[in-house]
Amino acid sequence: MKQKVVNIGDIKVANDLPFVLFGGMNVLESRDLAMRICEHYVTVTQKLGIPYVFKASFDKANRSSIHSYRGPGLEEGMKIFQELKQTFGVKVITDVHEASQAQPVADVVDVIQLPAFLARQTDLVEAMAKTGAVINVKKPQFVSPGQMGNIVDKFHEGGNDKVILCDRGANFGYDNLVVDMLGFGVMKKVSGNCPVIFDVTHALQCRDPFGAASGGRRGQVTELARAGMAVGLAGLFLESHPDPANAKCDGPSALPLAKLEQFLTQIKAIDDLVKSFDELDTEN
């Protein structure tokens, strides 16, 4: 079945093409750290031949605690993204939380992301669609894979068909997430074979019901990423940090930056193998 291709500049994103890495840090902690992390990602992905898009948030508007670090904000965040693009020649993805942010962010970055908690907010969807930018839609933890077709339809009605879908797990009881590997195929089907990517980092979150921040299971990041990529996906969404224990957001789920090359070597091998197979139709 023909898979839809979304172009991010010269990077082609599709379920049957070599996977694209959307990788970086959870939130911009400082200009210098962003430069360090981006440089390492660029070095490793160029060595391994993996198409790469840098990711980070300029504002984490949905932190559990009012006292948690949110980021540098819109103005400073866009300056950092511009410097990363100019210095390393990378594409950039970041999330927006309000309709008023959509165009200013789209003027700087290459992909704008619709957060999971906001994915059904029609005003925000319409504002993002109007920018004409490539869109990454995070599947809400509380929405089934089959419902994602409705969100894609909203973007199409808004005149934007450059849509990527991203799964980050589903609620499993209270304070836990699981990833349904069958859901990836459902999301492809209901969206007209839009590219589907896997956010392995946030799928590893495990909340403390009485805590002010999310916990995580980064010790299982490799096995979960390998399982997801074995389905045959357009990309992987990954967060890393040189010192996860002291990261300002989601450190417990972040891959240690020093392990990036070893990790991606395994992921690329699985992606290459899976996409070397002929498509097998078992419905007919």
UniProtKB/Swiss-Prot annotation:
It is an enzyme of class 2 (transferase). Keywords: Cytoplasm, Lipopolysaccharide biosynthesis, Transferase. It holds the Pfam family DAHP_synth_1. Pathway: Carbohydrate biosynthesis; 3-deoxy-D-manno-octulosonate biosynthesis; 3-deoxy-D-manno-octulosonate from D-ribulose 5-phosphate: step 2/3; Bacterial outer membrane biogenesis; lipopolysaccharide biosynthesis. One of its GO terms (cellular component) is cytoplasm. GO terms for biological process: keto-3-deoxy-D-manno-octulosonic acid biosynthetic process. One of its GO terms (molecular function) is 3-deoxy-8-phosphooctulonate synthase activity. Its EC number is 2.5.1.55. SUPFAM superfamilies: Aldolase. It is found in: Cytoplasm. InterPro entries: Aldolase_TIM, DAHP1/KDSA, KDO8P_synthase. It catalyses: D-arabinose 5-phosphate + phosphoenolpyruvate + H2O = 3-deoxy-alpha-D-manno-2-octulosonate-8-phosphate + phosphate. NCBIfam families: KDO8P_synth, PRK05198.1, PRK12457.1. Belongs to the KdsA family. This is 2-dehydro-3-deoxyphosphooctonate aldolase. It comes from Salmonella arizonae (strain ATCC BAA-731 / CDC346-86 / RSK2980). The gene is kdsA.
